[in-house]
């Protein structure tokens, strides 16, 4: 829907280290178009480090756009799509992203989806995500572990489903499971009791937007 961009969610190793491999692959395959990367301010220093030590021979520029907001903020707009960032509730600075297509004469309907990674339950999300077609929302724990979820700034199955229900989204995708989750049928049923149109994603799954 738009030229490749990278949207960084937060500054932690599991969200960050794969970026170096992505940049190296783009350079190896001769990318020339600028690459726009959005994320927390601190990510700029990491990208400068990469360019200093591994950027020789790169044919494309990395254009870093810092994200810092307390409510939804438009971070990218093209003829096809608007992308907004919004703050999540985690132990460190963390953002989600919403994508809204721009209607055209041939495609007058608006298609939208949103991605909420690491976050505790946050009531404002249902307002910010109102009406999206597809919502990905982390659901690290089953609801019996709501206290642990709150302590670790993550969400439960029921909380993710409540967000989807209150936001009146079309479909909910949950993932980011704790290693404690062994009964995926019970896990998914907890979500479906609140929001029936829900699927629990597995590695390698592909979803049509």
Per-region residue spans from a language model:
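Metal-dependent phosphodiesterase/nuclease catalytic metal-binding core
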Residues: 68-174, 183-194
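General small-molecule cofactor/ligand-binding pocket signal
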Residues: 38, 63-68, 84-86, 199-201
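Active-site metal-binding loops of divalent metal-dependent hydrolases
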Residues: 11, 42, 117-119, 139-141, ...
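A glycine-rich helix N-cap at a beta->alpha junction
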Residues: 50, 54-68
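Short internal beta-strands
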Residues: 34-42, 173-175
């Amino acid at each position: 829907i738009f030229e490749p961009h990278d949207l960084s969610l937060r500054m932690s190793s599991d969200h960050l280290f794969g970026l170096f491999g992505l940049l190296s692959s783009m350079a190896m395959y001769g990318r020339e178009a600028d690459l726009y990367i959005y994320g927390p301010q601190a990510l700029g220093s990491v990208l400068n480090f990469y360019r200093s030590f591994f950027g020789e021979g790169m044919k494309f520029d990395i254009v870093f756009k810092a994200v810092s907001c307390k409510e939804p903020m438009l971070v990218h707009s093209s003829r096809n799509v608007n992308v907004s960032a919004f703050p999540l509730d985690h132990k460190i600075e963390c953002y989600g992203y919403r994508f809204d297509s721009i209607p055209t004469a041939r495609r007058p309907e608006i298609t939208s989806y949103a991605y909420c990674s690491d976050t505790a339950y946050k009531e404002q999300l249902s307002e910010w995500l109102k009406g999206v077609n597809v919502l990905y929302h982390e659901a690290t724990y089953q609801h019996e572990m709501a206290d642990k979820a709150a302590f670790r700034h993550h969400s439960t199955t029921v909380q993710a489903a409540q967000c989807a229900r209150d936001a009146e989204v079309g479909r909910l995708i949950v993932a980011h499971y704790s290693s404690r989750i062994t009964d995926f049928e019970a896990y998914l049923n907890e979500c479906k009791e609140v929001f029936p149109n829900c699927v629990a994603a597995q590695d390698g799954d592909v979803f049509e937007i």
